[in-house]
C-alpha cells in the first residue's frame, strides 16, 4: 500500500461514519445538512440509488427521485461532512450495477422489485 492509500484509509477511519450496506436499486433516505444563513438543518432526500462508485475516500453514489413529475438526480460523496445519515428504506432486486436505463422510463416501467429476505428451508429429518 502506498502513501496516498494509507492516508486515505486513516482519513476514513478518522471520520468513522456509520454507512449502511446499500446497492443500486435500493431506496434510501439521505439526510443532508443544509446551511441557510446562520441556521443549520437536516434535509431528507429520498430516492432510488441508480449508481454507486467505490473509490475509497472518493466513493460516491447517485440517488434519483421523481419530484413534481420531473426526474431529479443528485450525486453524494459517501464520506462528505454534509451527509448527516443514510437510511435504507427498501431493498431492490436488480441485475445491473448501473441503473441508468431508469432515466428513460416513467410510471410502472420504472418500478423495481423488492428483494425479499431468504426463507430458510427446513428438511423433514431436521424437523422431527
Swiss-Prot record:
<dbReference type="InterPro" id="IPR008991">
    <property type="entry name" value="Translation_prot_SH3-like_sf"/>
</dbReference>
<dbReference type="InterPro" id="IPR038657">
    <property type="entry name" value="Ribosomal_bL19_sf"/>
</dbReference>
<keyword id="KW-0689">Ribosomal protein</keyword>
<comment type="function">
    <text>This protein is located at the 30S-50S ribosomal subunit interface and may play a role in the structure and function of the aminoacyl-tRNA binding site.</text>
</comment>
<dbReference type="Pfam" id="PF01245">
    <property type="entry name" value="Ribosomal_L19"/>
</dbReference>
<dbReference type="InterPro" id="IPR001857">
    <property type="entry name" value="Ribosomal_bL19"/>
</dbReference>
<comment type="similarity">
    <text>Belongs to the bacterial ribosomal protein bL19 family.</text>
</comment>
<dbReference type="GO" id="GO:0022625">
    <property type="term" value="C:cytosolic large ribosomal subunit"/>
</dbReference>
<protein>
    <recommendedName>
        <fullName>Large ribosomal subunit protein bL19</fullName>
    </recommendedName>
</protein>
<dbReference type="GO" id="GO:0003735">
    <property type="term" value="F:structural constituent of ribosome"/>
</dbReference>
<keyword id="KW-0687">Ribonucleoprotein</keyword>
<dbReference type="InterPro" id="IPR018257">
    <property type="entry name" value="Ribosomal_bL19_CS"/>
</dbReference>
<dbReference type="GO" id="GO:0006412">
    <property type="term" value="P:translation"/>
</dbReference>
